[in-house]
Amino acid sequence: TWNADAYSTRNYRRASSWYKKEFRTDAAQMRDKQLYLKFDGVNSLADVYLNGELLTTHKGGYSAFTVDITDKVRTDAPNLLMVHVNNQNDRIPPLSGDFTIFGGIYRNVWLISAAKQHISLTDYASTGIYVDLPSVSEDRAEISVRGTLVNRDVRRAVLKLDVEVLDTDGKTVAQSLRSVRIDADGAFAFEERLQLEKPQLWSPDSPYLYSVKVSLKDVRGKVLKDETRVPLGVRWFSVDAQEGFKLNGEPLKLMGACRHQDQMP
């Protein structure tokens, strides 16, 4: 960011600037790979160029975004990445407040290499995996795992999708395994439902976390294409006017906090 002094001055800089970065890649690195750029945070308006071509525009400094650069990178010459950033907006008062509009790239930027078949990286720059708990009790938890798989190859792909719930020791306590077919340059949305018997419930006093592991392998299950892990706390809650907030059936007094993210998520 160009606002390193924003905590100590009221009239910090609200303007636009350019970032430039040169990088190299070669044909061997790109073979059977997809290449992505992920920006964790750029404030407030970002235009991303690669080798002089505008790839994407992103509005908002508090959300990450990802762009596929596979077809734009050069393997025979240096690549020039340029990002034009503007944190000025004359229509939004005040200039200063109880939070800081840090200008520029103020979080990490990642260059990600993925197999041709992988878990989607462009779904709002998330992990591509969403875990929900349709029903939870002390006896049983139903776990929904959703996501999108993509195939950027010119041929249809037949793959193995393995969804596991792991305990804190890494032991598999619930699992779903099946074959999926993805058309050439296509996508496949999935949802797997798993049952967890006698779950260890999460609470502030006992913050037990499971881990949901989603693996994508070749049709024989030998070659790992992609893998993502998502932490999972199994719990249920309710709110009503008479009894207030309850966690896992027990009353819990909530003490809130107000903290602006400013620099880090």
Where are these regions (language model features)?
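Short glycine/proline/serine/threonine-rich loop/turn segments at secondary-structure transition edges
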Residues: 30-33, 73-78, 156, 196-211
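Conserved, mostly hydrophobic/aromatic
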Residues: 52, 109, 147, 210, ...
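Beta-strand-rich binding/interaction modules
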Residues: 50, 140-181, 190-192
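Short, solvent-exposed loop/linker segments at the N-terminal edge
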Residues: 133-141
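Accessory beta-strand-rich segments of carbohydrate-active enzymes
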Residues: 9-122, 126-128, 152-153, 168
